[in-house]
């Protein structure tokens, strides 16, 4: 599964993030369910038995496996694959009206994947090399679309597919170059979907809210830095 995170630098100096990936769904509706899956997938002779037990106690996970299989297809380019937000957010208008939405980044270049034979023998970093060459010819663009929830679509379960077909393009994300120097001079880069701006409200999705805690722990292990008040409140 591949991902794309975007950090918007706002005029007042604050930032807001979106996080997307190639899978349209998460494998679990709760953090504990995801941890249970990781434990069941630990290598060993008892893994098949552990996985069978997991699926018996988490039957909805079966529906996520075909989605994950599709998400693992090898793209011809990072620029020819779609990325999807797992979580819903409540968008609130100036007049107080509100709708729940999920995010999608759709490649302007259209989706294009490689067959197994075409991908065979490619260098491990061929996607990065391809993107660099593509950027030499101009920006890479994605349409920023939101899917508006229908009456039966869950705003708090990232493992549940939405039935709504109401999709609106709200902007364009443009990539103009590669940033090869990250986290220098004490600058710690964190893309946290709980970091929102005015008019966007996180839902009570437990996986969404757990991500801030997970990212804070990751930063502390990786850099020794405590995010402290910089981390969004959960």
Locate predicted features.
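Active-site-adjacent core segments of small-molecule enzymes
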Residues: 1-234
């Amino acid at each position: 599964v591949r991902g794309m995170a975007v950090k918007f630098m706002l005029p007042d100096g604050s930032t807001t993030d979106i996080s997307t990936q190639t899978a349209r769904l998460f494998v679990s509706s709760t953090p504990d369910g995801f941890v249970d899956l990781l434990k069941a997938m630990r290598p060993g002779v008892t893994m098949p038995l552990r996985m069978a037990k997991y699926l018996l106690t988490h039957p909805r996970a079966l529906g996520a496996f075909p989605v994950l299989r599709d998400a693992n297809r090898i793209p011809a380019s990072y620029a020819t694959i779609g990325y999807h937000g797992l979580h819903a957010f409540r968008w609130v208008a100036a007049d107080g009206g509100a709708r729940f939405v999920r995010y999608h980044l759709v490649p302007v270049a259209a989706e294009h994947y490689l067959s197994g034979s075409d991908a065979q023998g490619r260098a491990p970093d061929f996607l990065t090399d391809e993107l660099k060459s593509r950027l030499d010819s101009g920006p890479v663009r994605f349409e920023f679309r939101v899917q508006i929830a229908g009456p039966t679509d869950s705003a708090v379960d990232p493992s549940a597919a939405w039935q709504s077909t109401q999709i609106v393009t709200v902007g364009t994300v443009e990539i103009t170059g590669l940033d090869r120097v990250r986290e220098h001079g004490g600058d710690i880069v964190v893309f946290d979907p709980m970091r929102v701006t005015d008019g966007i409200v996180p839902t009570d999705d437990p996986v969404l809210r757990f991500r801030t805690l997970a990212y804070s722990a990751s930063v502390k292990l990786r850099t020794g830095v405590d995010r402290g008040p910089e981390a969004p409140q959960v």
